[in-house]
């Protein structure tokens, strides 16, 4: 395995935040041990906490590595200028701003955060509107769910992955027809 630069011993978001305060403008990466899943009120350093703090300083999560059966590390790096932003990460930034945790470095990296910054692909729009039941159910879903779910589909169009675009669109239409919201779209309620 290649050498891991800046493998931090941060045990929580506040310890990572302190490191980012000191190093976000000069370092190119860090690694933190995190756990994925539904955060609980315990001493675990959760993935979503690390991502939120990274976003506050203009950083983003990237590669994960499994060090052992019970230890996964997450690489965090500065965002590249003009990189694609997921709707989920935009909403995380909005939450951090409301909580007073966002820094100028984080704000400087943010894309258009207005509603005008999210445009639905015409193929997805047509597929939803072609079935009245799908359209009615879609309209009843929370706006954040709609943006996050659509974003995870249309990113595959932008990345020129037509098979995955079709597969995700079909799954979305099928679940929407049944009135089912699926997948992680609100960080287990944090973003509501």
Which residue ranges define each predicted feature?
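Charge-dense, helix-prone N-terminal extensions
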Residues: 1-192
